[in-house]
Swiss-Prot record:
Protein name: Spermidine/putrescine import ATP-binding protein PotA
Bilayer topology: Peripheral membrane protein
UniProt xrefs under InterPro entries: AAA+_ATPase (IPR003593), ABC_SmlMolc_Importer (IPR050093), ABC_transporter-like_ATP-bd (IPR003439), ABC_transporter-like_CS (IPR017871), Mo/tungstate-bd_C_term_dom (IPR008995), P-loop_NTPase (IPR027417), PotA_ATP-bd (IPR017879), Transp-assoc_OB_typ2 (IPR013611)
Protein's UniProt keywords contain Translocase: yes
Role description: Part of the ABC transporter complex PotABCD involved in spermidine/putrescine import. Responsible for energy coupling to the transport system.
Residues annotated to bind ATP: G38, P39, S40, G41, C42, G43, K44, T45
Length: 350
């Protein structure tokens, strides 16, 4: 398709009879930042390794710029990979690590010097050219790995959980750096991550995977606000799942005997084969009788930026709620939400 730099078509993979990928279909546009997100064992790293050329699929096609990628050897693919371990050379300094690929291609000395220094500036390592790799921090090593990959001018940069080894604050900073670099350079990034916040904060689109299948592809906003199935709703963030609600008609649902307005349509009439999702941060705590349901605070947990409450309402339903207000166990409250807080999806077929 037009502008697709990379296309995976019904890609499958198994190891000794154990199916790892169950027919992956994915189109990636030139210049996109795509993240494969999922729990351990979901197939995201295998997908990346197949694209990189480290693994062969059992079946399916991978097209790069409209041509079959699979017969092309790793060193001929216009990709570079950044690993979680960085894979830097400990006996080389920063400059020589970054220059390694250009030297193997016998790049002219003046061009090599110019390109390496350009990347050193790009990743903010000016003054570190002669520094020994073992004397660098984790974040600095990550910058060297990025510069070493980008100096080869790949058309696609593959990133295998590149920030996983960093501490929390440094990881957050490097997320911003990765996104900045990707925007400035304009090449396609394909990253693997198990970190939801990481994927949602820096990706143009997120590919949510589980048990070898793609569960949903969409923008971070779509993935979070419009999960396509129960698994995605539970995996991405936190959710209140109403499994016994009724879709009365377009823009109307029923929860515990009360009718609520929603934005959803095309689920039929009086349909029970649906789940209703309401995020904890979308529920407001009100005084008794001021909301939709009265309830009692059963549990409170301070999370730093907010309190997490468990409130029991009608029919013993327990609601998880995030609020900046402090409450005590046994406080009497009521709960309320806006129409757009309700999201309806079909129940998963067993």
């Amino acid at each position: 398709m037009e502008n697709n730099i990379l296309e995976l078509r019904n890609v499958t993979k198994d190891y000794d009879g154990k199916v790892v990928l169950k027919g992956i279909d994915l189109n990636i546009k030139e210049g996109e930042f795509i993240t494969l997100l999922g729990p351990s064992g979901c197939g995201k790293t295998t997908t990346l390794r197949i694209v990189a050329g480290f693994e062969k699929p059992n079946s399916g096609q991978i097209m790069f710029e409209g041509k079959d990628l699979l017969p092309i050897p790793i060193n001929k693919r216009q990709f570079n990979t950044i690993f979680q371990s960085y894979a830097l050379f400990p006996h080389l300094n920063v400059f020589d690590n970054i220059a390694f690929g250009l030297r193997t291609k016998k790049t002219k000395k003046d061009i090599l010097q110019r390109e390496v220094l350009k990347q050193i500036r790009q990743v903010g390592l000016e003054g570190f050219e002669d520094r020994n790799i073992n004397d660098l921090s984790g974040g600095q090593k990550q910058r060297v790995a990025i510069a070493r990959a980008l100096v080869m001018k790949p058309k696609v940069l593959l990133l295998d959980e590149p920030l996983a080894a960093l501490d929390v604050q440094l990881r957050q900073h490097m997320r911003e750096e990765l996104k900045r670099l990707q925007r400035e350079i304009g090449i396609t990034f394909l990253m693997v991550s198990h970190d939801q916040e990481e994927a949602l904060s820096i990706s143009d689109r997120v590919v949510v995977m589980n048990e070898g299948s793609i569960q949903q592809i969409g923008t971070p906003e779509d993935i979070y606000n419009e999960p396509e199935n129960l698994w995605v709703a539970k995996f991405i963030g936190q959710s209140n799942i109403i499994e016994d609600g009724i879709f009365i008609e377009d823009n109307k649902v029923q929860i515990d005997g009360k009718t609520f307005v929603c934005d959803d349509t095309n689920f039929g009439e009086n349909e029970k084969s649906i789940d209703i999702v309401i995020r904890p941060e979308d529920i407001e705590i009100k005084k008794t009788n001021a909301g939709f349901f009265n309830g009692t605070v059963m549990h409170t947990t301070f999370k730093g930026v907010h309190w997490e409450l468990l409130v029991e309402t009608t029919k013993k339903r327990i609601w998880k709620i995030h609020t900046t207000q402090a409450f005590k166990v046994d406080d009497k409250v009521s709960i309320k939400w806006n129409d757009e807080a309700i999201h309806v999806m079909w129940k998963e077929v067993e």
